[in-house]
Amino acid sequence: MSGGQAECAGRDDSKKIELAEGEQEQNMSNTIVTLKKGEGRTIKSGGLWIYDNEIATITGTFKNGDIVLVHDFDGYPMGRGFINQNSKIRIRMMTRKADQEVNEAFLRMRVKNAWEYRKNTVDTSSCRVIFGEADFLPGLVADKYENVLVVQCLALGMERMKETIVGLLKEVLAEDGIEIIGVYERSDAKERKKEGMPIVKDFIGPEFDTNVEIVENGVKYLVDVKDGQKTGFFLDQKYNRLAIQRICKDKRVLDCFTHMGTFALNAGIAGAKEVTGLDISEYAVQQATENAIRNGLQDVVKFWAADVFDELPKLEAAGEKYDVVILDPPAFTKAKNTIKNAMKGYREINIRGMKLVKDGGFLATCSCSHYMDYENFTKVIHQAAVSAHKRLRQVEFRTQAADHPILWSAEESYYLKFYIFQVVDEK
């Protein structure tokens, strides 16, 4: 399929599902994958990944991306998943029912269930409709920005089902009166290289304006779904941004790693008297400034380009103090072997942030790395408080928004940790 992706802009979309159905029929395989003795406990407890070193034998022929049947060492059927020998995650499970066909009806059920869940849990005007493993569609992300969809395929098997799923997404949303006017593919994550797949950024179907205005928590943003980070916007912090509104009225606020100005603008709309947003990216600062103007907050919320690690010591040396400091850094680690260095980074930035908070003010701090787990992140914050000679009173602890559900049997689905603390000087 990858050979045709670069040509998809403006193509006729009307036969997409029929073509994809044909591909899906070829996607099924009679291949049986048998696991080693003692392996398979993760799958039996609800996990979705089988690694290359867990497999004993493969019987039958297949192509990468095909659906195969998985047995445990004793020959007990464990379900079906798609296989890719280019990936260390050799099989991603699609169903634990060995007799269940992974066809269009199956995919429609998965998409429908994902959408019904969002309707019951979040504001769906802009939200993550499909969150990979947590929606039992491993390797697939689908974000809705008003009437635009952005899809991302991170696994080969899902890549081969992509066009069917896009068609089903449109159908399911249309049942609720939502007409999708455009779909853009943002399959440009590094994970694709591990799957042996090329980077893809392109329209699926007719071209459209890729700058989309959304409204979240009463704040307007212009989202660039083509060139913005991830799929264009960080939807996972939606309700964490709302949470900081309660502590920002009439306050002086510093928002670090502001990106598009999301936390800063939530502070501004809540009635903060002065908000400063910092980000190392000139492009991000430009976007944030435009968003401030869009919301009529340009006189209250200001942004400038700066390296936060360099700027915070300068602010401390200048005697600056803030009622609220917000720390929303990028992931300092994306692998287990870099956790120690990441902990140093989180510790340093939290020390710097705490020192800028007025006595009795507030610190909002978070980590978006799965590998920086709750225990390590909490430990780092405590160490930072000791080093900064501050006492912390926890206001609340939060995770990612409910449209990024945490599947307890898939620990990789839990990644965002978000705290609000009151910061008190040692006395």
Q: What spans do the regions from the language model cover?
A:
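Non-catalytic accessory regions of SAM-dependent methyltransferases
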Residues: 15-146
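A short, charged
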Residues: 105, 109, 113-117, 121, ...
